[in-house]
Amino acid sequence: MDQRKSVGMLSKGFLYRQRLGYGLGDFACNLIWQIISLYLLYFYTDVVHLGAKSIAVMFMICRVIDAITDVLVGFAIDKTKTRWGKSRPWFLFGAVPFAVAAFLAFSVPDISPDGKLLYAYATYIFLSFMYTVVNIPLASILPTLTDDMNERTVLATWRKFLAFLGSSIVSATALTLVQVTGRGNEALGFRIVMGMFGIVGCVCFFLTFFLVRENNLQENIKSATLKEMIMSLGKNTPWKVFAINIMFMWTGYFLQSSALV
């Protein structure tokens, strides 16, 4: 039986709820990850007093690990079969660990410098993995929400707008909230703010889970195996060029960031 539902068969109320729910997923991602992008390097170097070069190397290593986990999570989503669909469960079960990982990244204990660096490695790798867990499904779920190309464009627009809104909220309020809540103690302030944004992010991910529906599922299409996926990447010249470009981009970014600290 064909599970696809045309936009005309769905109520306007459902369409708007689904658009909002889909957008809230990226709102949550950016509300949490934007703090990481903007302030984690500063937190590690100026608040926790870790070496900028050590942190730059750590970020580079994590980017390499990310390249692997992105493929693995995508493969796992493709193999997921639940009554909620393939992608939706990842929002439900990934939300809290992602928020907790972000909180832990800003909760470096007062131990030796080597211990702090080891803690930073462990928490940042965990955080990056959990970001992959909740972010990759935002891309994989879109084709299953509708088979109407115009509606997919509308959904993508809602996603980008709410992602921008989440990033803007962080850029406009985070440092002020850190000063207010920490009362001069930046370490405490970052923990409190990350906890606040993490809670809001969790609620948004849960709303994404409850408001969207995977209807356009095609179970009869043969999925590639993990080995086939990896082999295809090795033969994909544009992908290899893109990967090298991304590596140089991140290297330049972190070298520049290190020089500014």
Model-derived segments and their meaning:
Residues 2-261:
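Membrane-embedded alpha-helical bundles of multi-pass transporters/translocases
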